[in-house]
Amino acid sequence: MKTLTLVAPAKINFYLEILGDRPDGFHELAMVMQSIALGDRLHLRQRQGQGFQLGCDRADLEVDERNLILKAAQRLQRSFPQIGGVDFFLEKRIPIGAGLAGGSTDGAAALVGLDIFSGLGLTQPELEAIAAELGSDMPFCVAGGTQLCTSRGEQLTPLPPLPSLSLVLAKFESLSVSTPWAYGRYREQFGDRYLQTEPARRDRLQALHAGPLLQAMSAGDPVAIAQHLRNDLEAVVLPEYPQVAELRSVLGNCSGILAAQMSGSGPSVFGIAENPTAAQAAVEQVRQAIADPDLKLWVTQTISHGIQTETLLR
């Protein structure tokens, strides 16, 4: 039986600015997304007949039609009926409901995996276009690396690869934040600040292109990068979830941590560390400051790629 294993990296947001409303109900965004080494593994195995089945090593993850792996497989098969039956098995390592694109990267891995498995020969832009139908951050997960993401997040502009940055990632395991709630609350509280015209939004994007964050990233300067992080959703999530605010503060004040910020709509928080030793020391400092068994911490790093093939057996 033919098998394939892929690694699906998580992402963090170095930058998330909400520019305004879109006619389709989404928000117009300007984001800098970054792939990190923490990732899931998706195994594909050829099966007799048609159809797809999904298993997972986490009992608390849906493995039915709601899962983006199956949604992605079914969407691709509608365009390419020659795709045969496949059994998927997911080794879940990215925390669930964390603002790290765990579901989207798994769906992206399904698209990439089926393309390889079935010999479709799709280009990356073709895969990204299909991914955009399934989720706003799924095109980024296909591409990976360091990207400026605009529109609702699906329009990608590659940025120069970063040197490997050491990171600490932290999340209360049982806590999740609804992404629609976070954006809806932001609209309620700050909608009067939205840019109302296309020229105004275009000018804002041009300013971001020429601004200090992208300059720091081009220079590979972690200290300067840390000085220019931004996540607009912190303004609504942190007051509503004080434990996330405390976690962000504690991590950000650890020795050797240059800055800390929430990723996406949360509740995960990441810190940029001076080096791997400082990252590991920060983990111990956070554990001492917040003695909660529900708090999970990881030491990881930035990477320059998206979905990658690990093994292919024929």
From Swiss-Prot:
The active site is at residues 11, 137. InterPro entries: GHMP_kinase_C_dom, GHMP_kinase_C_sf, GHMP_kinase_N_dom, IspE, Ribosomal_Su5_D2-typ_SF, Ribsml_uS5_D2-typ_fold_subgr. It catalyses: 4-CDP-2-C-methyl-D-erythritol + ATP = 4-CDP-2-C-methyl-D-erythritol 2-phosphate + ADP + H(+). It is an enzyme of class 2 (transferase). ATP binds at residues 95-105. Belongs to the GHMP kinase family. IspE subfamily. PANTHER family: 4-DIPHOSPHOCYTIDYL-2-C-METHYL-D-ERYTHRITOL KINASE, CHLOROPLASTIC. HAMAP family: IspE (MF_00061). This is 4-diphosphocytidyl-2-C-methyl-D-erythritol kinase. It comes from Synechococcus elongatus (strain ATCC 33912 / PCC 7942 / FACHB-805). The lineage of its organism: Bacteria, Bacillati, Cyanobacteriota, Cyanophyceae, Synechococcales. The gene is ispE.
